[in-house]
């Protein structure tokens, strides 16, 4: 049986400093109210020591001004870490994908750029393989309880439902889907289990559940409904929570997960 994966998320914004703009690790609540909590590279090293299976690095600014900072941050991480890195934020072109892979990314995370230009998924998958392509899908629960896809940091609604967009991504060669509940993000109330439970029957792709973890049991619940991995940012920013402790709880629940290097 394939082992479940535990993935800390490293989301950063840009902060001015006397030495110039620098990346600052932040946590969010429902994709808003960013709170700075440290340095992304330093935190990545801590997560590696705590047995993270992978790391997701995301530039929340996603602009042409922040792009060089994302590349520099990625270079610093890849030079000092052995943990696989999935990287995204503002990717709109194949050239940007190439730059990230050249700097040490193992996978690229496509979001708004893929919705606006779905052919980008085909191009990256055909060039580098499906295993390189993670599609990040941000969703909100609508009044009729359906889930719809939002882009631009959760500020723009699209015409895509979660299931129709997930199927389109799968048909184009995506290798994995990162599903984030905007409603649950940073609340600690638990994952959107219904979406993951239904989606596992819609697409034959590994699913990463994200948004809402506040207890180790929330990770267990995500795995039990079909997630191959659970990603979290705010949860691991708490002093009494880390990937090593969390995976022990997951193993005690009877789920297969790595416990040592």
From Swiss-Prot:
Annotated pathway: Amino-acid biosynthesis; L-histidine biosynthesis; L-histidine from 5-phospho-alpha-D-ribose 1-diphosphate: step 5/9
GO BP terms, alphabetized: L-histidine biosynthetic process
A molecular function (GO) term: lyase activity
UniProt xrefs under InterPro entries: Aldolase_TIM, His_biosynth, HisF, IGPS_HisA/HisF, RibuloseP-bd_barrel
UniProt xrefs under SUPFAM superfamilies: Ribulose-phoshate binding barrel
UniProt key word Lyase: yes
Primary location: cytoplasm
Catalytic residues in the record: 138
Any single Gene Ontology cellular-component annotation: cytoplasm
Location(s) in or outside the cell: Cytoplasm
Domain of life: Bacteria
Catalysed reactions, semicolon-separated: 5-[(5-phospho-1-deoxy-D-ribulos-1-ylimino)methylamino]-1-(5-phospho-beta-D-ribosyl)imidazole-4-carboxamide + L-glutamine = D-erythro-1-(imidazol-4-yl)glycerol 3-phosphate + 5-amino-1-(5-phospho-beta-D-ribosyl)imidazole-4-carboxamide + L-glutamate + H(+)
Keywords linked to the UniProt accession: Amino-acid biosynthesis, Cytoplasm, Histidine biosynthesis, Lyase
Function: IGPS catalyzes the conversion of PRFAR and glutamine to IGP, AICAR and glutamate. The HisF subunit catalyzes the cyclization activity that produces IGP and AICAR from PRFAR using the ammonia provided by the HisH subunit.
Subunit structure: Heterodimer of HisH and HisF.
Family: Belongs to the HisA/HisF family.
Protein's recorded name: Putative imidazole glycerol phosphate synthase subunit hisF2
Species: Prochlorococcus marinus (strain MIT 9313)
Organism ancestry: Bacteria, Bacillati, Cyanobacteriota, Cyanophyceae, Synechococcales
């Amino acid at each position: 049986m394939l082992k479940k994966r535990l993935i800390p998320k490293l989301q950063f914004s840009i902060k001015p400093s006397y030495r110039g703009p620098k990346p600052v690790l932040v946590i969010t609540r429902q994709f808003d109210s960013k709170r700075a909590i440290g340095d992304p590279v330093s935190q990545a090293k801590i997560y590696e020591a705590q047995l993270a299976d992978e790391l997701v690095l995301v530039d929340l600014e996603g602009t042409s001004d922040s792009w060089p900072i994302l590349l520099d941050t990625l270079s610093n991480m890849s030079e000092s870490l052995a943990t696989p890195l999935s990287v995204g934020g503002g990717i709109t072109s194949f050239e940007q994908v190439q730059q990230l892979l050249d700097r040490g990314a193992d996978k690229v995370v496509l979001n708004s750029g893929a919705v606006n230009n779905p052919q980008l998924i085909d191009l990256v998958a055909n060039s580098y393989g499906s295993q390189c392509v993670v599609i990040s899908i941000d969703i909100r629960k609508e009044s009729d309880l359906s889930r719809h896809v939002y882009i631009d940091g959760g500020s723009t609604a699209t015409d895509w439902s979660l299931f129709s967009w997930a199927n389109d991504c799968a048909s184009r060669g995506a290798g994995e889907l990162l599903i984030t509940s905007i409603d649950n993000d940073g609340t600690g109330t638990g994952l959107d289990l219904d979406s993951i439970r239904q989606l596992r029957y819609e697409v034959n792709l590994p699913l990463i559940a994200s948004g809402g973890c506040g207890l180790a049991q929330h990770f267990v619940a995500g795995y039990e409904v079909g997630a191959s991995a659970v990603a979290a940012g705010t949860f691991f920013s708490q002093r009494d929570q880390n990937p090593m402790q969390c995976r022990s709880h997951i193993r005690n629940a009877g789920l297969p997960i790595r416990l040592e290097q």
